[in-house]
């Protein structure tokens, strides 16, 4: 069975096209079959490397589904978990040396760093897209190169403003504001009340990349244009840096060194009024045995990421996708495992158990009951649908992956916020770093 394949234009209208447009790709083919399968090789066994959990329900259901797969196929699957920051370098090593896990759940555009080291997944991806309503635009951008699927998108750990409702109301707001200037105002009020904001400015692969790219694009700045020419050193970028520098003055101390776990810990310690994060903070409080944290959970709310001067959402979320490495002895078993895990019977219960921690890349899963039965998850539903991609508005490839892996945007904001460099110098220095990858 075969399956048919399917400018920030200098103004904010490009953001509307990129983010608000968020078309579905992989529209159902008239040839798509209800279920496809890959016959595992004799004696197949698999090893999967994935990022470590922030939500227990994610890991619990992932392992239960994996056990179901083994029972159905006889293929054992070993699952190893790594800290978020370690997944990318370990995947790169595996690709370079030609040995390691059969499957790795990587970040963002990792597959574009070593596409020739991966097993093509076009048949599987087109089947899933045809069966489950189509792939969102960002998912197809991340998963494909030259029309072929090199990764299989799992979704994104979405970022929303996570805040304490009472403290926000004490600051004079009914809910967390959605305008950049109002965010700056509330940050000052929360600091005055002793409940400051705090967002990661260290090498946090999810948190720092997410909110800082959102701010950069919200001011109209970007790494490259549609021709992949570096345009980071611009007045728009400087405006974004000046804004974050002022915002940082109202942050809790220590955010320059924060990694992904830090804001969770500080928030749950009762020290933060607001941060940008996934649903994991609320999940941890709600499911804690500590009555104080359970009480805190009632006061934790989620709001969409604020919109900047461009007037459209400009979000980046921690995108993750599966890669099957070319050195595997069992490519069919690997593809069958992924097919099984992405099917509705496994994916929806897993997403529900994780309370929507991973926003789906396939449109049909917008109907998962998690979004209505767990109302505090609803703000996370459309994260992948509405997100842009790192390297916007250029192409994904080795250059975009390298600049992301080197934290060029994050370092630029951290240098400007801390005063290590002026906003203008930070933008110029970051652009020079980026040009080494894009030349």
Stretches with model-predicted labels:
Residues 7-30:
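N-terminal export signals
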Residues 33-40, 107-160, 184, 211, ...:
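Hinge/lid segment of periplasmic solute-binding proteins
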Residues 36-37, 55-76, 409, 427:
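Short, polar/charged alpha-helical segment
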Residues 40, 109, 280-296, 308-408:
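C-terminal lobe and pocket-closing loops
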Residues 40-41, 76-77, 169, 386-439:
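Conserved C-terminal helix/tail region of periplasmic/extracytoplasmic solute-binding proteins
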Residues 64-135, 144, 166-178, 266, ...:
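Extracytoplasmic "Venus flytrap"/periplasmic binding protein-like
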Residues 146-154, 159, 184-230, 236, ...:
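Extracytoplasmic/periplasmic solute-binding protein
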Residues 186-193, 227-256, 301:
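Glycine-centered hinge/linker elements that transmit conformational signals in sensory
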């Amino acid at each position: 069975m075969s399956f048919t394949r399917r400018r920030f234009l200098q103004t904010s209208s490009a953001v509307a096209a990129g983010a608000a447009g968020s078309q579905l790709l992989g529209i159902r083919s008239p040839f798509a079959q209800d279920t496809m399968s890959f016959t595992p090789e004799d004696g197949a066994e698999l090893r999967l490397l994935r990022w470590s959990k922030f939500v227990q329900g994610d890991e619990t259901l992932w392992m239960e589904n994996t056990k179901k797969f083994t029972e159905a196929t006889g293929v054992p699957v070993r699952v190893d978990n790594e800290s978020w920051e370690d997944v990318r370098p370990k995947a790169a090593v595996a690709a370079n040396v030609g040995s390691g896990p059969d499957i790795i759940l990587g970040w963002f555009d990792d597959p574009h760093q070593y596409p020739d080291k991966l097993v093509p997944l076009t048949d599987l991806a087109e089947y899933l897209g045809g069966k489950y309503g189509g792939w969102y635009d960002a998912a197809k951008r991340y998963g494909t190169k030259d029309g072929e699927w090199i990764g299989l998108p799992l979704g994104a750990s979405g970022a929303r403003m996570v805040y304490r409702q009472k403290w926000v109301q004490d600051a004079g707001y009914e809910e967390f504001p959605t305008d950049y200037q109002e965010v700056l105002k509330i940050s000052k009020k929360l600091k005055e009340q002793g409940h400051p904001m705090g967002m990661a400015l260290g090498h946090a692969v999810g948190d720092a990349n997410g909110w800082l790219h959102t701010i950069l694009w919200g001011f109209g700045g970007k790494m490259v244009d549609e021709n992949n020419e570096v345009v980071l050193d611009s007045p728009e970028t400087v405006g974004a840096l000046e804004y974050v520098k002022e915002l940082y003055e109202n942050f809790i101390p220590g955010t320059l060194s924060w990694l992904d776990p830090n804001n969770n810990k500080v928030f749950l310690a009762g020290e933060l009024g607001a941060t940008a994060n996934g649903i994991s903070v609320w999940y941890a409080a709600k499911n804690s045995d500590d009555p104080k944290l359970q009480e805190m959970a009632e006061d934790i709310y989620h709001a969409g990421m604020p919109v900047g001067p461009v007037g459209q959402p400009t979000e980046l979320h921690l995108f993750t996708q599966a890669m099957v490495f070319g050195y595997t002895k069992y490519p069919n078993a690997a593809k069958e495992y992924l097919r099984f895990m992405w099917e509705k019977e496994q994916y929806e219960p897993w997403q529900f158990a994780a309370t929507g921690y991973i926003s789906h890349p396939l449109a049909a899963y917008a109907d998962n009951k998690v979004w209505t039965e767990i109302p505090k998850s609803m703000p996370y539903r459309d994260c992948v649908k509405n997100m842009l991609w790192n390297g916007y508005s250029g192409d994904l490839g080795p250059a975009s992956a390298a600049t992301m892996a080197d934290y060029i945007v994050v370092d630029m904001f951290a240098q400007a916020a801390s005063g290590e460099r002026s906003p203008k110098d930070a933008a110029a220095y970051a652009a020079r770093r980026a040009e080494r990858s894009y030349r």
